[in-house]
Amino acid sequence: MAFRTPAVQLHLKACVLLLLGGLLEAAYQERGTMYMWIDANQARILIGFEEDILIVSEGKMAPFTHDFRKAQQRMPAIPVNIHHVNFTWQATDQAEYFYEFQTLRSLDKDIMDDPTVNVPLLGSVPHKASVVQVGFPCRGDQDGVAAFEVTILVMDAGGNIILRTPHNAIFFKTCQRAKCPGGCRNGGYCNERQVCECQDGFYGVHCEKALCSPRCLNGGLCMSPGVCICPPGYFGSSCERANCSTTCLNGGTCFHPGKCICAVSFEGVRCELSKCRQPCRNGGKCTGRNKCKCSKGYHGDLCSKAVCEPSCGAHGTCVEPNRCQCREGWHGRHCNKRFRGGVSNSQRVSPSKHKSPSVAAAKEAPETSQPSETNYVV
């Protein structure tokens, strides 16, 4: 490291203080306390020796800021290797201060973008010591010195102006052309840190990768933001649809070229085969291999058996949901009543609102015909 004389160090310290202190102009503060300073670590980076530098103490500015206009003429440009300046501020006790960054503007946008800060542009000075970082984002496109403006206003709780940057305060930053190995693609540019800064929708070391949202599926390649190139057999904005040469049947869905996802009760290349070799009866649905889900009122492997609740007992057979067919000599809703005196079933059947065809046929049969051996009784 090159040797610095005390005179040179003093000059550097003065320049840094002018740069940071020039952001603010002193004003009288009747009550409350505010501090602003550069910590020792930041001072070492800026001026080469380690000590805290006070900018504002108890609401009063350092004396060198009072004649900022003259000092500004002697202020050097910020060096290439300094990308930002940090200062710390704090409002102690119950004091309330409010700030506003009114101007953050680069006058040479082809060399440097607008200055940045890491805090909201409008807010209150925190009661806990907090770091404010002012950044100087060189574009890295060319060598040169960029001029920029920073205007900040600080007020107390009563709206009185406490601190204010002089209007049209101009600062300077030295920038140089950056070189990123491999270059930056898709409109990205190389910043002064030799890192590619990508346009929206691109990422990667060289901005070579596009960002698709949602992402490209089934091996699709994102070529530009929101544009997928699909592999053979797929299509759609995200390559989410397969192109099947044959149509999937019975509600099947094509998920891969030539392949179908079948509904639960079907199988086969095109979902053309039912999983139940014998069809489910009485409205039942096939839910798996030879497995039926029966509709209400039926049960059995093929849903061929009706359910009667209560049952038809020992003298009847359930032939339809809640409908019993009684054996000869028995009648009643559940076939639990015996005929007396040898009277035939056809002579003792009570009318029903829900007659089966066999009941109607038995009633309309000629008197000479033989009585039916069975009967639906409701």
Swiss-Prot record:
<feature type="disulfide bond">
    <location>
        <begin position="276"/>
        <end position="286"/>
    </location>
</feature>
<keyword id="KW-0732">Signal</keyword>
<feature type="disulfide bond">
    <location>
        <begin position="308"/>
        <end position="318"/>
    </location>
</feature>
<dbReference type="GO" id="GO:0048794">
    <property type="term" value="P:swim bladder development"/>
</dbReference>
<dbReference type="Pfam" id="PF12661">
    <property type="entry name" value="hEGF"/>
</dbReference>
<feature type="disulfide bond">
    <location>
        <begin position="138"/>
        <end position="175"/>
    </location>
</feature>
<keyword id="KW-0677">Repeat</keyword>
<dbReference type="GO" id="GO:0009986">
    <property type="term" value="C:cell surface"/>
</dbReference>
<feature type="glycosylation site" description="N-linked (GlcNAc...) asparagine">
    <location>
        <position position="243"/>
    </location>
</feature>
<feature type="region of interest" description="Disordered">
    <location>
        <begin position="343"/>
        <end position="378"/>
    </location>
</feature>
<protein>
    <recommendedName>
        <fullName>Wnt inhibitory factor 1</fullName>
    </recommendedName>
</protein>
<keyword id="KW-0245">EGF-like domain</keyword>
<dbReference type="Pfam" id="PF02019">
    <property type="entry name" value="WIF"/>
</dbReference>
<dbReference type="InterPro" id="IPR013032">
    <property type="entry name" value="EGF-like_CS"/>
</dbReference>
<feature type="signal peptide">
    <location>
        <begin position="1"/>
        <end position="28"/>
    </location>
</feature>
<feature type="glycosylation site" description="N-linked (GlcNAc...) asparagine">
    <location>
        <position position="86"/>
    </location>
</feature>
<feature type="disulfide bond">
    <location>
        <begin position="184"/>
        <end position="196"/>
    </location>
</feature>
<dbReference type="Pfam" id="PF21700">
    <property type="entry name" value="EGF_DL_JAG"/>
</dbReference>
<feature type="disulfide bond">
    <location>
        <begin position="180"/>
        <end position="190"/>
    </location>
</feature>
<feature type="disulfide bond">
    <location>
        <begin position="244"/>
        <end position="254"/>
    </location>
</feature>
<dbReference type="GO" id="GO:0016055">
    <property type="term" value="P:Wnt signaling pathway"/>
</dbReference>
<dbReference type="GO" id="GO:0060828">
    <property type="term" value="P:regulation of canonical Wnt signaling pathway"/>
</dbReference>
<feature type="disulfide bond">
    <location>
        <begin position="230"/>
        <end position="239"/>
    </location>
</feature>
<dbReference type="GO" id="GO:0005102">
    <property type="term" value="F:signaling receptor binding"/>
</dbReference>
<comment type="function">
    <text>Binds to WNT proteins and inhibits their activities. May be involved in mesoderm segmentation.</text>
</comment>
<keyword id="KW-0879">Wnt signaling pathway</keyword>
<feature type="domain" description="EGF-like 4">
    <location>
        <begin position="272"/>
        <end position="304"/>
    </location>
</feature>
<feature type="domain" description="EGF-like 1">
    <location>
        <begin position="176"/>
        <end position="205"/>
    </location>
</feature>
<dbReference type="InterPro" id="IPR038677">
    <property type="entry name" value="WIF_sf"/>
</dbReference>
<feature type="domain" description="WIF">
    <location>
        <begin position="36"/>
        <end position="175"/>
    </location>
</feature>
<dbReference type="GO" id="GO:0090090">
    <property type="term" value="P:negative regulation of canonical Wnt signaling pathway"/>
</dbReference>
<dbReference type="InterPro" id="IPR050969">
    <property type="entry name" value="Dev_Signal_Modulators"/>
</dbReference>
<feature type="disulfide bond">
    <location>
        <begin position="294"/>
        <end position="303"/>
    </location>
</feature>
<feature type="domain" description="EGF-like 5">
    <location>
        <begin position="305"/>
        <end position="336"/>
    </location>
</feature>
<dbReference type="GO" id="GO:0005576">
    <property type="term" value="C:extracellular region"/>
</dbReference>
<keyword id="KW-0217">Developmental protein</keyword>
<dbReference type="GO" id="GO:0021986">
    <property type="term" value="P:habenula development"/>
</dbReference>
<keyword id="KW-1015">Disulfide bond</keyword>
<feature type="disulfide bond">
    <location>
        <begin position="212"/>
        <end position="222"/>
    </location>
</feature>
<dbReference type="InterPro" id="IPR003306">
    <property type="entry name" value="WIF"/>
</dbReference>
<feature type="disulfide bond">
    <location>
        <begin position="262"/>
        <end position="271"/>
    </location>
</feature>
<feature type="disulfide bond">
    <location>
        <begin position="248"/>
        <end position="260"/>
    </location>
</feature>
